């Protein structure tokens, strides 16, 4: 009669949390579970049935302590409203949120939506997402079950809808990757599907990105290129990973050098509103370009040498500003001027300095600087240090 009873026998459930209205068939729940414990009492059953019949649809609650006792130690019943208006929906949501106070780290949850309102399963998914992603309780959803009682077969099939919840996890991971470059959630999901090697590559990519390791980032980006073809031959990831990985790689499709990779990454940071990272990466791209242009090996000493050269050119430009403002600047002067102005903004960001301009002006300035630098780098201008 109740799928919950079959779930109990199959999975050996510790405790039940039942959710329903004052008009739900609580007397049948009592009958089913108390009979299994040989504690059924006819008078209790009749009294409960009468109370349910006499209670109006707007009744706040009825006494269901006998049902909780029949369900077993630790079990709890939550009585909700019909949800016919916003006030009742909010009331129901608050009831659901109380579950977050009871669930504990390590709990394994089996959800039965067979006898519920259609809206209850939606509530449950919202609450479980809240528990896992906001208050961060380590719980595991083992199954989301629906008993197809309308089937004409003598044996009624039970469908596990856990795949819906898993898809929500994939969507969450996709959002983290798309907006922040964080692949950790997706890496965990990929690993669960048995792809340990590519889970490691995903984590390495995000580690390099978040640490700002420009030297290894080009290699990490290249490691993503065949991810959608190799990693996921089946499974939910096939619906998510190709889209987000290809959207990210689109930024780098024309990048042939390390400096171009860094330049394009600065634009990706900007488009995803990580403005500090965008300035940092644009500056690093300009230094890398300077090393490439001078045919320097890209190491610390040569990068410092390149920075000093650009600062010296800008310093000379400023020293003779009254004369220079009437002539066309060389490519080296324009490039060095932008680099030094970016350095000032970056230092203000990094050291919480007193900015001479508003934040919005610095954000707008990035696009101007990016477009100018991009144009010069694409033309492969020659820098004269």
Question: Where do the PLM segments sit?
Answer:
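Catalytic or ion-translocation cores adjacent to nucleophile or general acid/base/metal-coordination motifs
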Residues: 135-165
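Polyanion-binding interface signature
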Residues: 224-336
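Histidine-centered, metal-coordinating catalytic motifs and their short helical/loop contexts
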Residues: 326-361
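Amphipathic, Lys/Arg-enriched alpha-helical patches that create a basic surface
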Residues: 363-385
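Long, charge-rich alpha-helical interaction segments
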Residues: 158-257
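N-terminal extension/subdomain marker
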Residues: 1-61, 377-384
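A broadly used, surface-exposed interaction patch
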Residues: 29-106
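Short Gly/Thr/Asp-enriched flexible loops that form oxyanion-binding sites at enzyme active sites
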Residues: 118-135
């Amino acid at each position: 009669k109740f799928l919950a009873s079959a779930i109990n026998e199959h999975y050996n459930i510790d405790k039940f949390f039942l959710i329903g209205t004052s008009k739900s068939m609580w007397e049948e729940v009592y009958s089913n579970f108390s009979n299994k414990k040989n504690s059924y009492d006819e008078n209790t059953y009749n009294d409960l049935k009468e109370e349910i019949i006499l209670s109006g649809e707007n009744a706040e609650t009825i006494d269901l302590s006998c049902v909780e006792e029949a369900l077993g130690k630790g079990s709890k019943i939550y009585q909700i409203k019909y949800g016919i208006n916003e006030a009742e929906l909010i009331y129901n949501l608050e009831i659901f949120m109380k579950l977050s106070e009871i669930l504990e780290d390590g709990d394994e949850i089996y959800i039965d939506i067979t006898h519920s309102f259609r809206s209850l399963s939606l509530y449950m998914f919202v609450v479980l997402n809240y528990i896992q992603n906001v208050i961060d309780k380590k719980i595991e959803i083992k199954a989301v079950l629906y008993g197809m009682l309308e089937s004409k077969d003598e044996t009624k099939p039970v469908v596990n809808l856990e795949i819906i919840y898993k898809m929500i996890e994939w969507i969450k991971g996709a959002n983290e990757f798309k907006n922040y470059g964080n692949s950790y959630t997706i890496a965990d999901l990929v690993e669960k599907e048995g792809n340990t090697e590519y889970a490691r590559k995903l984590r390495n990519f995000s580690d390099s990105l978040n640490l700002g390791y420009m030297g290894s980032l080009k290699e990490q980006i290249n490691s993503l290129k065949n991810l959608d073809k190799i990693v996921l031959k089946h499974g939910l990831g096939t619906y998510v990973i190709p889209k987000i990985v290809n959207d990210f790689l689109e930024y780098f499709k024309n990048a042939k050098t390390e400096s171009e990779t860094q330049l394009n990454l600065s634009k990706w940071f900007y488009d995803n509103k990580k403005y500090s990272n965008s300035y940092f990466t644009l500056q690093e791209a300009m230094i890398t370009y300077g090393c490439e242009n001078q045919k320097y090996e890209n190491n610390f000493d040569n990068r410092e040498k390149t920075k000093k050269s650009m600062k010296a050119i800008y310093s000379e430009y400023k020293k003779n500003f009254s004369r220079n403002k009437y002539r066309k600047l060389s490519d080296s002067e324009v490039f060095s001027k932008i680099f030094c102005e970016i350095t000032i903004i970056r230092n203000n960001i990094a050291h919480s300095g007193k900015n001479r301009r508003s934040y919005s002006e610095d954000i707008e300035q990035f696009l101007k600087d990016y477009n100018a630098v991009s144009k010069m780098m694409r033309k492969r201008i020659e820098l004269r240090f």
